[in-house]
Amino acid sequence: LYVIDHITYYSLDEDSYEKRIEAKRSFVQPNGWGIDYPCLLSPYENVYHEVMFRSDMPELFQLLGESNLTVEIPSVENGHLQMNGKQVRYTSKQQTLPFSNTEQIEVSIPPYTTQRITVLIEYYWFETRYALYAVHPKTGKRRTINGTLQSKMPAAYYITRENIK
């Protein structure tokens, strides 16, 4: 089996990401009282940073075995893709990395109304080509695995409110 030597990403100097917004959850909240009703939300609850490696030759994933498969991946910081020490496992399976923002917000439902509350999450989505360099520890033979890294990283949230009655 081969071991990972290093990985190189090809398009980090470009603004090669885009922002995408997804509805995370939506619910109806009635308020039959004569005062505002406080509704506490955790917008990032069950939100993850999703990462997936695709190889041009998927069978090459098996060259690496199951141990020591950690590589660094880029993320978006200050509006640019850059390396910042974030480590993930090099695998063909989609990974859901914890997103540790526990922020809570309070939404007030006005008296005698019913509102639909929708939590929208904005993600930084990007794809970048990579070359992973591996070496056989006994023979010194080198292999290069080319592919694409896909990443969907939470960036912001928005709350929409619609009066139903």
State what each model feature region is.
Residues 1-60, 88-165:
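Core pore-forming/fusogenic effector modules of secreted, proteolytically activated toxins
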Residues 62-91:
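Polybasic, Ser/Thr-rich amphipathic helices
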